[in-house]
């Protein structure tokens, strides 16, 4: 991937979504990424999965900021749009963008709680 200028994203996933999955925390993925040692292998940090599996989102984001390349957004419970669950998305956005200087990709991977228009509005507000 590195020789071709491509990037690989390593995504830990919750056992709620994939029972028996072997890589379920940001640190387990980070260990693999750091052993590989390529700047083109990054952590895909899925906020929904990591809240379910480890919580403490701010500290895990800070600890792994140097290798995060992509972020999936979905609130808990239900994997709905930001603001519908327990995650403080305005604060996470502040930590990621203002404090850590994250300039990677944010992707909304969710199921709209109400209408698509309401979901799009929440996405724009983010």
Predicted regions, residues:
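Histidine-acidic metal/acid-base catalytic patches
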Residues: 3, 7, 23-45, 49-126
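Surface-exposed cleft-lining segments at the edges of enzyme active sites
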Residues: 14-21
